[in-house]
Amino acid sequence: MSTESMIRDVELAEEQLPKKAGGPQGSRRCWCLSLFSFLLVAGATTLFCLLHFGVIGPQREEQFSSGPPFRPLAQTLTLRSASQNDNDKPVAHVVANQQAEEELQWLSKRANALLANGMGLSDNQLVVPSDGLYLIYSQVLFKGQGCPSYLLLTHTVSRLAVSYPEKVNLLSAIKSPCQKETPEGAERKPWYEPIYLGGVFQLQKGDRLSAEVNLPQYLDFADSGQIYFGVIAL
């Protein structure tokens, strides 16, 4: 082969090289365009999902973060009704008459006493206005000086029910301040004995409750807050 023919073959190969390279470059451009389109669609889909579910963008819940939580009207009315029902429950707290001599007499018209929401005081008894559970409580304070004889002090809360004609004791307690009689000529030392009673009972409308002692002459009327009787609806 001559030198001229070899040179001609090389020139022909160089002319054909761009044509052969054009095929791979075209397919590469198509692949890049497809990848760009896929990424664009995927990005748009992701952005839509984030906006739809509130991950990004303005959040309405933050507008109420500084104020009180939103409460439906029905829930507000229910809570208000429950509060009003609690305030409407019957309640009584009466205190002893400090002017009574050797008698336990209950008074409701005092600064530290009350009758509310249907509770009544009649014949020294508290009258229940409606059926339900009630907390009943009472306290008395006995005092004396020396022991002329053996003493038994009792405090009792009784119920006179509409459905039962006889009085029934609900709460009762006994205390003895004197174990033995004070001898003649010995020092007569003062003594004090408090008794507190309390319990929960099912009562009916019209029931009458009384708090009594067996020896009222030993009651200490020095302070009205020491002797009291009360009922609270639960």
Curated annotation (Swiss-Prot):
The record marks 34-35, 39-40, 49-52, 79-80 as: Cleavage. One of its GO terms (biological process) is positive regulation of MAP kinase activity. It is found in: Cell membrane. It is a single-pass type II membrane protein. GO terms for cellular component: cell surface; extracellular space; plasma membrane. The modification Phosphoserine is found at residue 2. Residues 90-234 form the THD domain. It holds the Pfam family TNF. CDD domains: TNF. A lipid is attached at residues 19-20 (N6-myristoyl lysine). Residues 1-35 are cytoplasmic. Disulfide bonds join 147-178. The soluble form derives from the membrane form by proteolytic processing. The membrane-bound form is further proteolytically processed by SPPL2A or SPPL2B through regulated intramembrane proteolysis producing TNF intracellular domains (ICD1 and ICD2) released in the cytosol and TNF C-domain 1 and C-domain 2 secreted into the extracellular space. The membrane form, but not the soluble form, is phosphorylated on serine residues. Dephosphorylation of the membrane form occurs by binding to soluble TNFRSF1A/TNFR1. Gene3D superfamilies: 2.60.120.40. Keywords: Cell membrane, Cytokine, Disulfide bond, Lipoprotein, Membrane, Myristate, Phosphoprotein, Secreted, Signal-anchor, Transmembrane, Transmembrane helix. One of its GO terms (molecular function) is cytokine activity. Residues 57-234 are extracellular. The chain crosses the membrane at residues 36-56. Its main location: membrane. PROSITE patterns: THD_1 (PS00251), THD_2 (PS50049). The keyword Cell membrane applies. Cytokine that binds to TNFRSF1A/TNFR1 and TNFRSF1B/TNFBR. It is mainly secreted by macrophages and can induce cell death of certain tumor cell lines. It is potent pyrogen causing fever by direct action or by stimulation of interleukin-1 secretion and is implicated in the induction of cachexia, Under certain conditions it can stimulate cell proliferation and induce cell differentiation. Induces insulin resistance in adipocytes via inhibition of insulin-induced IRS1 tyrosine phosphorylation and insulin-induced glucose uptake. The TNF intracellular domain (ICD) form induces IL12 production in dendritic cells. Homotrimer. Interacts with SPPL2B. Belongs to the tumor necrosis factor family. This is Tumor necrosis factor.
